[in-house]
Amino acid sequence: MLPLYPDISPEIIAIAIGSGAIGCTIVTDSLFWLVKQYCGATLNETFKYYTTATFIASVVALAGTFLLSFII
């Protein structure tokens, strides 16, 4: 994909990939279970709050990456 868009910085692509990856947190993720045990929450509570939080973090990071792409 990078050769098709030579104006896009490879660093921005890497940040965008990382930003999108944190939004896909599911119950098979080991950090999900670590957060569940550390917080003492039920499975439903952890799924609701942790998944929502990581999704919001991913969207904010992608928006920041988009803004950063204008600077770099």
UniProtKB/Swiss-Prot annotation:
Signal peptide: none annotated. InterPro entries: Glcn_transporter (IPR003474). GO terms for cellular component: plasma membrane. GO terms for molecular function: gluconate transmembrane transporter activity. Transmembrane segments: none annotated. Disulfide bonds: none annotated. It comes from the Bacteria. This is Putative D-serine transporter DsdX-like protein.
